[in-house]
């Protein structure tokens, strides 16, 4: 095989399903947009939560996204029939799991400090690393187990650290909000595994449409008794909630078009300092050093997981001796 042929083969392997070639600058740009809009989603959710329940926020968040998507599809001439799937029950099942995760996240958002929420939420890649081998047949490696143990040690530090440091004067921070944050991480884990499976057969738009329709219907059915029309400036926060969450998911998907997950994921961790800053500056939340230590352990666990994934991809893409002739 010639050098030129090898280069062309490598470029073809790096090219993704959309036909786009890797572009680091665009990947970084879209990831930063995602990081910012996810933080704005949390801010809007906190403000909306002063006037409505978490279930109502899930409804407005997804109903607004649904309207935007339908208008965009009409404008672009995309037929809804083209978004249908031969696996509707699996799509609904995945969407239902994500609905539970989104509701848990919204509930935790109203109950615990933002640094605790974002730190516990970011344990979901570690759950994926442990459970994907069981559900998708991926390899369970020692680095994956080590990464998960580091992350879960971080969770223990976040929950029990303040109690240990104070000599028992401060009660453990495990509460309904903490339970909801951990629950959302587990639900997001199963959602990620389901998405990995479904993307083998369906487009991202199909998955997104099933999600927003499912969430809008479920949230309305479960929360219609407390559902109220937003009044005054609350409309601005509700619109911000729906628009920013849709932009965040779209931007993250676009980032993955131009770069692999092992490139995008470390940049996504910028959400942690941004959420911490939001909590401290806007809501006067206290930043406890021991909680920060737990957060760093979660980050370290994710870092090991990303390093292992990068190493695996490099090994799998390396040409064999026979192929290099």
What is each stretch, according to the model?
Residues 1-30, 129-182, 186, 299-325:
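Juxtamembrane helix-loop boundary signature in multi-pass membrane transporters
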Residues 2-8, 26-27, 51-100, 187-191, ...:
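Transmembrane alpha-helices of multi-pass small-molecule transport proteins
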Residues 12-18, 66-86, 155-170, 215-236, ...:
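Membrane-interface helix-cap regions at the ends of transmembrane helices
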Residues 26-34, 79-104, 175-184, 229-247:
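Loop-to-transmembrane-helix transition segments
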Residues 56-59, 63-64, 109-137, 261-278:
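Specific alpha-helical transmembrane segments that line the substrate/conduction pathway
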Residues 117-123, 198-214, 249-280:
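Helix-helix packing/entry segments at the starts of transmembrane helices
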Residues 125-149, 226, 273-292:
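C-terminal transmembrane-helix exit sites in multi-pass transporters
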Residues 165-227, 317-325:
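Transmembrane alpha-helical segments that form core, pore/gating elements
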């Amino acid at each position: 095989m010639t050098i030129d042929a090898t280069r062309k083969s490598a470029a073809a392997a790096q090219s993704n399903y959309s036909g786009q070639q890797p572009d680091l600058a665009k990947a970084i740009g879209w990831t930063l947009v995602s990081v910012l809009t996810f933080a704005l989603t949390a801010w809007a959710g906190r403000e909306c939560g002063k006037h409505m329940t978490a279930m109502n926020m899930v409804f407005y968040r997804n109903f607004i996204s649904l309207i935007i998507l339908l208008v965009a599809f009409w404008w672009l001439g995309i037929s809804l029939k083209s978004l249908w799937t031969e696996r509707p029950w699996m799509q609904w099942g995945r969407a239902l799991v994500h609905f539970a995760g989104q509701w848990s996240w919204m509930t935790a958002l109203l109950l615990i400090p933002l640094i605790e929420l974002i730190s516990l939420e970011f344990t979901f890649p570690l759950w994926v690393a442990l459970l994907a081998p069981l559900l998708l047949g991926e390899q369970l490696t020692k680095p994956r187990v080590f990464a998960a143990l580091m992350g879960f040690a971080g969770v223990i530090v976040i929950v029990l650290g303040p109690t240990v440091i104070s000599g028992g004067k401060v009660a453990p921070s495990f509460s309904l909000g903490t339970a909801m944050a951990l629950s959302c991480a587990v639900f997001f884990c199963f959602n990620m595994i389901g998405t990995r499976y479904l993307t083998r057969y369906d487009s991202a738009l199909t998955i997104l449409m099933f999600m927003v329709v499912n969430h809008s219907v479920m949230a309305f059915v479960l929360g219609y008794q407390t559902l109220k029309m937003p009044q005054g400036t609350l409309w601005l926060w509700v619109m911000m909630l729906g628009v920013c969450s849709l932009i965040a998911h779209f931007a993250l998907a676009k980032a993955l078009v131009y770069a692999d997950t092992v490139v995008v994921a470390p940049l996504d961790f910028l959400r942690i300092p941004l959420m911490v800053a939001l909590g401290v500056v806007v809501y006067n939340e206290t930043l406890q050093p021991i909680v920060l230590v737990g957060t760093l352990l979660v980050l370290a666990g994710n870092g090991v997981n990303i390093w292992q994934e990068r190493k695996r991809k490099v090994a799998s893409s390396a040409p064999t001796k026979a192929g290099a002739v």
